[in-house]
């Protein structure tokens, strides 16, 4: 079976720092290692999508199966599920687009995780254009 590849282009944008909080929670760290095969850097790279084709490809991800990180109940909170898609960004992998079940982001903003601090590894700053290949 061949892997289908979707292309998404966008520009780097600043986040609120929430990705750093969630990616420091042991449940998510261990789950990403188990399901994606890597321990993510403690922070996400946020990308804003600005063209129609990339946005249509992003919307396909809502319907695609993806890799599901299950919801997890702890004594004083519930950690929501996350849908993930193995990806590369500007030809760097491993990486993954993550779509939390509970998010404040509009559909035009995606979050990327990787074992690397992607801003540094790719010399990125806000407004820089990136291309993501998503493997379905």
Curated annotation (Swiss-Prot):
<feature type="binding site">
    <location>
        <position position="46"/>
    </location>
    <ligand>
        <name>Mg(2+)</name>
    </ligand>
</feature>
<keyword id="KW-0418">Kinase</keyword>
<dbReference type="Pfam" id="PF01982">
    <property type="entry name" value="CTP-dep_RFKase"/>
</dbReference>
<keyword id="KW-0547">Nucleotide-binding</keyword>
<feature type="binding site">
    <location>
        <begin position="15"/>
        <end position="20"/>
    </location>
    <ligand>
        <name>CDP</name>
    </ligand>
</feature>
<feature type="binding site">
    <location>
        <position position="44"/>
    </location>
    <ligand>
        <name>Mg(2+)</name>
    </ligand>
</feature>
<keyword id="KW-0288">FMN</keyword>
<comment type="function">
    <text>Catalyzes the CTP-dependent phosphorylation of riboflavin (vitamin B2) to form flavin mononucleotide (FMN).</text>
</comment>
<dbReference type="GO" id="GO:0000287">
    <property type="term" value="F:magnesium ion binding"/>
</dbReference>
<dbReference type="GO" id="GO:0009398">
    <property type="term" value="P:FMN biosynthetic process"/>
</dbReference>
<keyword id="KW-0479">Metal-binding</keyword>
<dbReference type="InterPro" id="IPR023465">
    <property type="entry name" value="Riboflavin_kinase_dom_sf"/>
</dbReference>
<comment type="pathway">
    <text>Cofactor biosynthesis; FMN biosynthesis; FMN from riboflavin (CTP route): step 1/1.</text>
</comment>
<dbReference type="GO" id="GO:0009231">
    <property type="term" value="P:riboflavin biosynthetic process"/>
</dbReference>
<feature type="binding site">
    <location>
        <position position="111"/>
    </location>
    <ligand>
        <name>FMN</name>
    </ligand>
</feature>
<keyword id="KW-0808">Transferase</keyword>
<dbReference type="GO" id="GO:0008531">
    <property type="term" value="F:riboflavin kinase activity"/>
</dbReference>
<comment type="similarity">
    <text>Belongs to the archaeal riboflavin kinase family.</text>
</comment>
<dbReference type="InterPro" id="IPR023602">
    <property type="entry name" value="Riboflavin_kinase_CTP-dep"/>
</dbReference>
<feature type="binding site">
    <location>
        <begin position="116"/>
        <end position="119"/>
    </location>
    <ligand>
        <name>CDP</name>
    </ligand>
</feature>
<protein>
    <recommendedName>
        <fullName>Riboflavin kinase</fullName>
        <ecNumber>2.7.1.161</ecNumber>
    </recommendedName>
</protein>
<keyword id="KW-0460">Magnesium</keyword>
<dbReference type="InterPro" id="IPR039063">
    <property type="entry name" value="RibK_CTP-dep"/>
</dbReference>
<feature type="binding site">
    <location>
        <position position="103"/>
    </location>
    <ligand>
        <name>FMN</name>
    </ligand>
</feature>
<dbReference type="InterPro" id="IPR023470">
    <property type="entry name" value="Riboflavin_kinase_archaeal"/>
</dbReference>
<keyword id="KW-0285">Flavoprotein</keyword>
<dbReference type="GO" id="GO:0000166">
    <property type="term" value="F:nucleotide binding"/>
</dbReference>
